[in-house]
Regions:
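Sec-dependent signal peptide recognition
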Residues: 1-7
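Hydrophobic h-region of N-terminal signal peptides that target proteins for export
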Residues: 8-16
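Catalytic-site neighborhoods of secreted/periplasmic enzymes
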Residues: 74-187
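Alpha-helical packing segments of well-folded alpha/beta enzyme cores
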Residues: 27, 48, 103, 145-149, ...
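Active-site-proximal N-terminal segment of extracellular/periplasmic enzymes that hydrolyze or transfer
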Residues: 18-57, 66-67, 176
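Generic enzyme active-site microenvironment
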Residues: 27, 117, 272
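Active-site-proximal cap/lid insertion segments
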Residues: 18, 33-35, 39-41, 155-159, ...
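Loop/turn elements at helix/coil->beta-strand transitions in domains of secreted/extracellular proteins
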Residues: 20-22, 57-60, 110-113, 158-161, ...
């Protein structure tokens, strides 16, 4: 149960002077590790994520267990490799044998109040209330999730709490690639002069396995970018970064609620993502492939005994 062990280790390292700290786990969907301004990316501005990272420990070499939402989340909340327990594709049901061993259940059994808001995707989009150890405090929607979490944080808790805030964005880049409307408000069409440049590894890799090109060709609804021009890809990257900024603003509301309720002294905050996005590298959108942009994920914890980053 490697993820659970890692999660426990992160919490204990941040909380050596805190007995039974509160735990807040915030994670996004499809956010690559370079998609933060504090990662040195000049194409976006993420003051709230930067604020968390500056106060904590940033793990530069964090990788997801699987480059797809359902399997990655399965690993997060069970601690098992997805293929080992039948969670290898989106829509795979959680095995009954694991329901009593999930992260929420284990932490609840340790004496915590456990709450979950936002996207679940194992396989239902929302976590069933009172299952997997969690009270469901909000539906699968980025709109209103921060407010629901802020309300939860304002309560007078008799026990330490474990709060999960699971955001959908920047996953809405999938809708952009398919020319569909965004669920949480559209992004303005930019002038091409305002768009980021192409990545250094924009060209397709001639040594890629045939299965990668086959996946691209045979799943047009997932990878509708075969006809994208370089300008289209630049606009894709612009839109992706605006979606990251959108979710950064929402996460800022949760950070403000932590401030208002004076929770920093006895609270550990962990931030991560389930996987990244191709963002045009190798002319790839979405996930699934084992490209660095897709498997290298955000991971950091706050607060930290001192500001630092580690390559672990």
């Amino acid at each position: 149960m490697k993820y659970l062990a890692c999660f426990s280790l992160l919490c204990s390292s941040m909380a050596s002077a805190i007995e039974r700290p509160n735990i807040i786990y915030i994670f996004t969907d499809q956010q690559t590790a370079s998609a933060m301004s504090c990662a040195g990316n000049p194409d976006l501005h993420t003051p709230n994520l930067d604020r968390l990272a500056a106060a904590g420990i940033l793990f530069n070499n964090a990788y997801c267990t699987a480059p797809l939402s359902g399997p990655s989340r399965g690993a997060m909340f069970t601690g098992y490799y997805p293929d080992a327990v039948g969670l290898s594709v989106n829509g795979s049901p959680m095995p009954d044998s694991l329901k009593a061993q999930t992260l929420g259940t284990l932490i609840k059994n340790a004496g915590y109040d456990c709450a979950y808001g936002g996207k679940w995707h194992l396989p239902l989009l929302e976590v069933p209330d009172k299952e997997y150890g969690f009270d469901n405090i909000y539906k699968h929607s980025d709109d209103g999730l921060a407010e629901a979490c802020a309300e939860y944080l304002s309560r007078k808790h008799k026990k330490p709490f474990f709060l999960v805030a699971s955001y959908d964005n920047p996953h809405n880049i999938c809708e952009y690639a398919r020319r569909q409307n965004f669920p949480y408000g559209n992004i303005d069409i930019p002038d091409i002069r305002d768009c980021p440049g192409l990545p250094a590894n924009f060209a397709k890799n001639p040594y890629d396995a045939d299965v990668i090109e086959s996946e691209r060709i045979n799943n047009y609804n997932v990878y509708p970018t075969a006809g994208f021009t370089p300008e289209d890809w630049r606009m894709y990257r612009y839109t992706y970064y605006r979606l990251v900024e959108k979710v950064d603003r929402e996460i800022g509301k949760i950070i403000d609620a932590i401030d208002r309720n004076n929770l920093w002294e006895n609270t550990v905050v962990i931030f991560s993502s389930d996987h990244g996005d191709g963002i045009g590298a190798h002319r790839w959108n979405q996930k699934s492939a084992l490209y660095e942009e897709i498997i290298n994920c955000l991971l950091y914890t706050s607060p930290s005994p001192r500001d630092r980053s580690v390559s672990r």
